[in-house]
A protein has these predicted regions:
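Structural micro-motif
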Residues: 68-80
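Non-catalytic, surface beta->alpha helical segment in thiol-disulfide oxidoreductase systems
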Residues: 78-115
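Residue-level detector of flexible, active-site-proximal loop/helix-junction positions
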Residues: 36, 60, 92
Length: 115
């Protein structure tokens, strides 16, 4: 089953269509996942502070999947001024091991550096 999911992730850029995620200025968190992996959605992302939060479904936004080299979902990427600063990826079971506290600490570190 995991092999099938991995194959689906790799094939999505070929068979899907794009909504094109836009990563802009400032401190942003993008939570990449896929509709077929909603059971492993990272619910706590919405609780992060001092940043803009975006969601991206790689099943429908295959350009973003390719551009940001998403190979496993969920993946959380912290962007600052459009540049990737930190990436948190799920393990082989498609479960996120990073915690709200860990990601918030990194956000606070970056947010503090901007002042």
């Amino acid at each position: 089953m995991r092999f099938i999911k991995l194959c689906m992730i790799m094939l999505l850029p070929i068979i899907g269509f794009s909504q094109t995620l836009k990563v802009g200025d400032g401190l942003q968190i993008v939570h990449f996942n896929a509709g077929w992996n909603s059971a492993n959605d990272v619910e706590w992302v919405k609780d992060l502070e001092n940043c803009k939060i975006k969601q991206c479904d790689i099943a429908t936004d295959t350009d973003a999947q390719s551009k940001h080299e998403i190979v496993v979902v969920p993946t959380i990427i912290i962007f600052n001024e459009g540049e990737e600063v930190k990436r948190y990826q799920a393990d082989i079971s498609f479960s996120m091991k990073a915690t709200l506290e860990e990601v918030q600490e990194k956000v606070n570190e970056i947010y503090g550096d901007d002042f």
